[in-house]
């Protein structure tokens, strides 16, 4: 049985391939665009059966000439995830139409389809629950994800021929994101800031939040891969699910975790947030005028629906997850 993973050389896709490998599954077709050639490193430690360029893959899908038999599932992680990309034509073709064509093909062939949505569909809201009235995307990236989620809702009412699951990823961090540049996680940037400068910067106070007190639902990519495989194991489950921890943590906590993990590798003791600030290992910079009124101070996934689907595992909190991530970066990137 063959499994197809799109975006397989990317951040989340390569972690799904790795998680499948850990189960002994290697009959995997990895689909990606390696124009950014350095991404190959994410697959170098994985076992796959074949690599296929994204453009050739979607051509074969649209013409119904893919040569693979007995496809067990498609994990669709291939998309433009740059929220600052305002090219609507590209975003809608790459994120919406490509995904729609894959959905149609999977439904025709009765193949389970698990795809990446995004918490960006919620915009600047304060309640993050999988309900239409709470979804107000602020950019074309969020809109491209929102629009496809709407397609799934309509299809579910009409009746599906095979499983379809959309995951609304919150702030994901972890191994294999180094190719993302400025779009990599805050944990990634804090690690490199500290290694280069000996301190990390956080935004100062704004909009009722104190220094570094803005919060996010930070979720480890290890948990993200684990949940993708949970739904793969339960083909009776379809729908749209938030994929976060259900816990909102301050940027202060993430910065402290990153700095202390680096210090531990240097044989130094753990410091409290107060001590890290006093020693100027965490510094606060003025909140940018350009972001005032546009910056989200809080996100927290409502994971009630995920728990109702039977997922019982605990998530890494920021301290544990970032500590594991820093150890990986020290071994692989430093």
From Swiss-Prot:
Its cofactor is NADP(+). It catalyses: ADP-D-glycero-beta-D-manno-heptose = ADP-L-glycero-beta-D-manno-heptose. Binds 1 NADP(+) per subunit. Keywords: Carbohydrate metabolism, Isomerase, NADP. GO terms for biological process: ADP-L-glycero-beta-D-manno-heptose biosynthetic process; carbohydrate metabolic process. SUPFAM superfamilies: NAD(P)-binding Rossmann-fold domains (SSF51735). It comes from the Bacteria. Contains a large N-terminal NADP-binding domain, and a smaller C-terminal substrate-binding domain. Homopentamer. This is ADP-L-glycero-D-manno-heptose-6-epimerase. It comes from Neisseria gonorrhoeae (strain ATCC 700825 / FA 1090). The lineage of its organism: Bacteria, Pseudomonadati, Pseudomonadota, Betaproteobacteria, Neisseriales.
